Amino acid sequence: MAHRLVVVSFDSLQENDLPVLAAMPNFARILPKAAVVRRVRPIYPTLTYPIHTTLITGVPPKQHGILHNQIPGLERENPDWSLYGSDWYWYADTVQVPTLPQQAQQAGRKAASVLWPVTAGQVEYLSVPPIWPDKRQDPQQLLRQAMTPGAFDRFWARYHSHYKWHNVDDMHFYGVEIALEVLEQDKPDLLLHHVEHLDSTRHRYGDSGRDVYDCLRQLDIILG
């Protein structure tokens, strides 16, 4: 393969963000040469985990099986308990159709993913999945089971062991550093990286405002 493909998802980025980003240094370099698709027709439900699974399968949720971020269930002991369910769709084996990175590996290419939803427990390619412990779980044991063999020993001590699990901003920025290391050292033909920072900011502060603008500036730095 003469070229490598890097897919970076800036979660919650909207069309009306583009004029703001166009005035920032790094987006200003690429947007004039970019193919911009406006008024994208979304899947239903428009939630992070179903959307990102559709992106790497090409099929809607009713086919790939990821119908929500969370698995339906009632477990009141879990601090993330809600009517939607306590547990999230963390694990790759819940996807019911082949994915793009799996197909790349089977075609003799090298794939990798960093914080891409629904990739925990993946063994076919390098995966550093988004997953966090509940109050009863040991983070070290959970991550060892969820990450690709070898990835835990490589990244735990330098990154995950320092996470403050109640502060998702830690995961956002460590994730970028891990993705850069994977890109430079592993040289995958396909790299998937999910950047959740803007989505978390909008959940916390609303759709617009100073905090959202500051987050867009941070995305420009990440892009650079």
Task: Give residue ranges: language-model regions.
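Extracytoplasmic/secreted envelope proteins and their assembly/folding machinery
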Residues: M24-F27, V176, D220
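N-terminal secretory/membrane-targeting segments
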Residues: M1-H3, V20, M171-H172, E181
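Short, structured active-site-proximal loop/turn typified by the sulfatase FGly-forming signature C/S-X-P-X-R
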Residues: L18-H64, A112
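His/Asp/Glu-rich, glycine-adjacent segments
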Residues: V59-G206
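Glycine-/proline-rich flexible loop or hinge segments
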Residues: F10-S12, V36-R38, T48-I51, R76-Y89
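A conditional alpha-helix N-cap/helix-loop micro-motif detector
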Residues: V20, D93-T94, H172-F173, L216-L219
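Charged helix-capping and loop-helix junction motifs
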Residues: A23, D207-Y213
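Beta-strand elements within well-structured catalytic alpha/beta cores of enzymes
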Residues: A2-N16, R29-L31, L55, A104, ...
